[in-house]
UniProtKB/Swiss-Prot annotation:
Its main location: membrane. It is found in: Cell membrane. Keywords: Antibiotic resistance, Cell membrane, Lipid metabolism, Membrane, Transferase, Transmembrane, Transmembrane helix, Virulence. GO terms for biological process: lipid metabolic process; phospholipid homeostasis; response to antibiotic. The chain crosses the membrane at residues 9-29, 53-73, 90-110, 130-150, 162-182, 201-221, 230-250, 271-291, 338-358, 367-387, 393-413, 416-436, 451-471, 490-510. Its EC number is 2.3.2.3. Catalyzes the transfer of a lysyl group from L-lysyl-tRNA(Lys) to membrane-bound phosphatidylglycerol (PG), which produces lysylphosphatidylglycerol (LPG), a major component of the bacterial membrane with a positive net charge. LPG synthesis contributes to bacterial virulence as it is involved in the resistance mechanism against cationic antimicrobial peptides (CAMP) produces by the host's immune system (defensins, cathelicidins) and by the competing microorganisms (bacteriocins). GO terms for cellular component: plasma membrane. The keyword Transmembrane applies. This is Phosphatidylglycerol lysyltransferase. PANTHER family: PHOSPHATIDYLGLYCEROL LYSYLTRANSFERASE (PTHR34697:SF2).
């Protein structure tokens, strides 16, 4: 049998053993808990003096400070130049997390190695010392096991009745002398020969502190037994927890304590309550404190420290790669810790709803209590819904949390006024203030998908809350009390109304305060940039007056955009100095992220697609633009006789074409407006991606007009200079609809011939929407669907007809794309673009 196979078999048997043990513990624990009277447990909790609870929780929080002795010994042994106060802070965080997700202490060992390696260049010795600390956590329990075997801590009622307990105690007791002999005989450092002994003493103190906290919890719930006997039971329970490999020994430890105390004639209800209080005091409270410390310990200071650490010098590319992620993780620790604290706060006060309900049952003013219940439930739900926003540093999410904490505090003061809970709310409020000051964004974009998820999550949480309350009331057998049950029925709807009011009012006020209005832009700066660096087929639309412009820091490039529904819809590619485009987009994305806006690019070319890709965007092909090569365009030849026939027809009818240069007279503009109004026939103007029929906009470029034999204007088209590459575009094309003449063909042909005569090289006839989109089997599904629309919905919009019309001019087809951010919906992005185009 190979070594690899042996290793796999050993891992498999370990997994089978741990799983079987876990299942056994769960079933046994379930069987024991099924006999417990939860009503009696709840009543016992109500009788506890709140001052004793505060002292218990304080004791649980302070007990973990003793574990800092491990780190002090480590720092002294390695002679690390690390401030003592920081040693205590880091140690507390490590030990609190290790107690919850320890996995035999390996989590704590890993975090210790990560933190302390920045203070020493002897990594090998550091790892050896950490290994001693890791193993010594068991040696303290081994010392206590010896005392149990010697009956100093008397647990004879368990040892005599359960044979496997005796053998486990013997085995663990033997571990201590072996460990001490080995570490003294073969020390890591001869100058610190007794390192293992010191750590064993600390480990023993650690386990005794945990036993003392549990004993104090037992005394609070009126369990009175000898401390020596109690510690004996605790040691056996702790060994069971270690053997189970479950973090914190959850389940196995509790089961042994329950069985051990129950065999002494103590009621199960009291034991269960003592265990719950112990778990909260020794595990939950330290974790909460550790999360608070993390908010201060790991932030910009830690990141700066890593940058300046003389020991943390990567010697390999892979090390440098890992270091970059370590810095990112450290920077996120404060916001992550606060998010966890907010989530836990919400859970705590959701559970405390039981207290409001219970007190309300026996109070004459039921209505006030259930309003307080609805307010607190709404506030707790808002906290949960904004956990991710707080983690992302959103000011709006933090404001929601502010309001929620105030509402919870108000409900707490009115109902059960717990000093401990109010103190906790004050701490959270202070942390939120600090988070608000360093918040990175105003708000995060609210998308339909996220809104639907939040709605489903809210319903699920409210349902769980209902199950919790109704199940508890049923267990407490309180339904015989005569109350106005309609209040309980309306409680759900009161909660919904309160949430809607809170969310609606805060969102409206926030958007009102930070809404970016449309400002008049500096067209002189746009002119200067376009004249110096050139434009594109859409750059002339900057004069339409319905867009904002975003400039880079050097003021040598800009983009045109419109704000709509929490989105910034950008028209076309950036304009200006191409070397500045990346910095321009980076600044624009930072601005949008801070404001909480989505970014959508409409009608971009494929020239800068790699640049858009660098910003994590997705692409959708909108269609293709028809670009006519004027150097080869002609009306001569057999294939062009249709063009000549059209031109000859207009000549026969004495219909003339001319280009009118600005400035325009008022009479000329009135003629244009008459034709435009007839052509629109009551329809609304399009916006954003086409020009505006305003005197200001039309005065920026020449206009081609066609007049009949009497001099009456019957058609016109406005031009869009591109200011680059000797290209020109057509913009507005309008004619009198009552005339049965090919006026559109006439305008295009005359414009093409005029442009060629003026020396232009290319003429843009505009885009054929959805043209040549999704034609391959390998295309994206969304593009194949768009292709089907192009093929089969020609009656709704003349997709194919538009392309066929432009095909006769033999253009070159250039693709145009919609660019939208990842995790965003294509259809939502398209709808926002359509709203920008359809509405002014």
């Amino acid at each position: 049998m190979t070594q690899e196979l042996k290793s796999k078999l050993l891992s498999f048997f370990k997994f089978i053993f741990a799983t079987a043990l876990f299942i056994f513990v769960i079933f046994t624990l379930y069987r024991e808990l099924s006999h417990i009277n939860f009503k009696e447990t709840f009543i016992q909790f109500g009788k506890i003096n709140r001052l004793w609870l505060v002292l218990l929780f304080a004791g649980g929080g302070l007990s973990l400070i003793l574990l800092s002795l491990y780190d002090i010994i480590l720092v002294k042994a390695l002679k690390l130049k690390m401030p003592l106060i920081r040693v205590f802070r880091v140690s507390y965080i490590i030990n609190a997390l290790n107690s919850i997700i320890g996995f035999g202490g390996f989590i704590g060992a890993g975090v210790r190695a990560f933190v302390y390696k920045n203070y020493t260049n002897d990594t090998k010795k550091l790892v050896q010392y950490i290994s001693i600390i890791l193993v010594s956590m068991l040696t303290g329990l081994s010392l206590l096991s010896i005392l149990v075997v010697l009956r100093i801590f008397n647990a004879s009622h368990m040892i005599d009745e359960i044979s496997w307990v005796r053998w486990i105690l013997y085995i663990v007791a033997l571990f201590l002398p072996i460990f001490i002999f080995y570490t003294v005989a073969r020390p890591v450092d001869r100058n610190n020969r007794y390192m293992g002994v010191y750590c064993t003493v600390v480990s023993c103190v650690e386990w005794m502190a945990a036993a003392t906290v549990l004993y104090f919890a037992a005394l609070i719930v009126d369990i009175h037994i000898s401390f020596m006997t109690f510690v004996g039971i605790f040691v056996i329970a702790a060994l069971s927890g270690l053997v189970s490999f479950i973090p914190g020994g959850f389940g196995a430890f509790d089961l042994v304590v329950l069985l051990g105390l129950k065999s002494l004639g103590i009621s199960e209800e009291k034991i269960l309550l003592a265990l719950v209080l112990y778990r909260f005091a020794y595990y939950f409270v330290p974790v909460m404190i550790a999360l608070i410390l993390s908010s201060f310990e790991f932030g910009n200071t830690a990141k700066k420290y890593l940058d300046n650490s003389k020991y943390f010098i990567p010697v390999k590319d892979f090390t440098s790669f890992l270091r970059s992620y370590q810095k990112d993780i450290l920077a996120k620790v404060p916001s992550f810790s606060l998010a966890i604290l907010i989530f836990l706060t919400s859970i705590i006060f959701f559970i405390n709803n039981l207290t409001i309900v219970y007190d309300g049952l026996y109070d004459g003013n039921h209505f006030a209590y259930y309003i307080a219940l609805a307010i607190q439930t709404s506030a707790c739900l808002l906290l949960i819904l904004n956990v991710r926003g707080i983690y992302k540093g959103s000011r709006r999410a933090i404001i929601y949390a502010f309001i929620s904490i105030i509402l919870i505090a108000s409900a707490t003061i009115y109902t059960y006024a717990s000093f401990l809970l109010l103190s906790w709310l004050i701490i959270i409020f202070v942390l939120l203030i600090l988070a608000y000051q360093r918040a990175q964004v105003l708000k995060r974009p609210l998308r339909f998908k996220k809104l639907a998820f939040m709605l489903l999550l809210s319903i699920f949480i409210l349902y769980l809350n209902h199950i919790l309350i109704s199940g508890t009331l049923y267990a407490l057998d309180v339904y015989h009390i005569e109350i106005d049950t309609s209040l309980l029925r309306y409680y759900f709807w009161m909660t919904i109304v309160i949430i809607m009011l809170l969310v609606g009012v805060i969102a409206w006020l926030f958007d009102y305060k930070y809404k970016r209005p449309h400002h008049s832009i500096d067209l002189t700066l746009c002119d200067a940039i376009i004249q110096k660096y050139g434009g594109n087929y859409l750059s002339h639309l900057v004069y339409s007056g319905d867009k904002d412009c975003f400039f880079n820091e050097n003021k040598d490039s800009f983009i045109m955009y419109r704000y709509k529904s929490n989105a910034l819809v950008v028209l076309g590619d950036p304009i200006g100095n191409t070397k500045s485009f990346e910095s321009l987009l980076e600044a624009f994305y930072q601005f949008a992220e801070y404001q909480g806006y989505e970014i959508i690019f409409y009608q971009i070319s494929d020239q800068y697609m790699p640049l858009y890709h660098n910003f994590g965007n997705q692409f959708f092909k909108l269609g293709e633009e028809a670009i006519i090569d004027l150097t080869t365009f002609t009306t001569s030849g057999k294939k062009r006789r249709g063009f000549r026939a059209t031109l000859n027809k207009f000549d026969d009818l004495n219909i003339n074409f001319e280009i009118i240069e600005p400035p325009f007279t008022q009479d000329f503009f009135d003629e244009l407006k008459f034709v435009s109004d007839k052509w629109l026939d009551g329809r609304s103007e399009m916006h954003f991606s086409v020009g505006q029929f305003t005197q200001t906009y039309l005065s920026k470029a020449p206009i081609g007009v066609m007049r009949d034999h009497s001099g009456k204007m019957i058609a016109f088209c406005s031009l869009m200079p591109t200011y680059s590459n000797n290209a020109i575009s057509v913009d507005l094309i309008r004619w009198l609809p009552e005339l049965d003449l090919p006026l559109m063909d006439g305008l295009y042909l005359h414009m093409l011939l005029w442009s060629k005569e003026k020396g232009y090289k290319a003429f843009n006839m505009g885009m054929a929407t959805l043209s040549n989109v999704g034609q391959l089997h390998y295309s994206y599904l969304r593009e194949r669907m768009a292709g089907r629309v192009f093929e089969h919905f020609n009656g709704l919009y003349r997709f194919q007809g538009l392309r066929r019309y432009k095909e006769k001019y033999s253009p070159n087809w250039e693709p145009r794309f919609l660019v939208y951010q990842k995790h965003y919906s294509l259809w939502e992005s398209m709808l926002k673009v359509m709203r920008v185009i359809r509405h002014k």
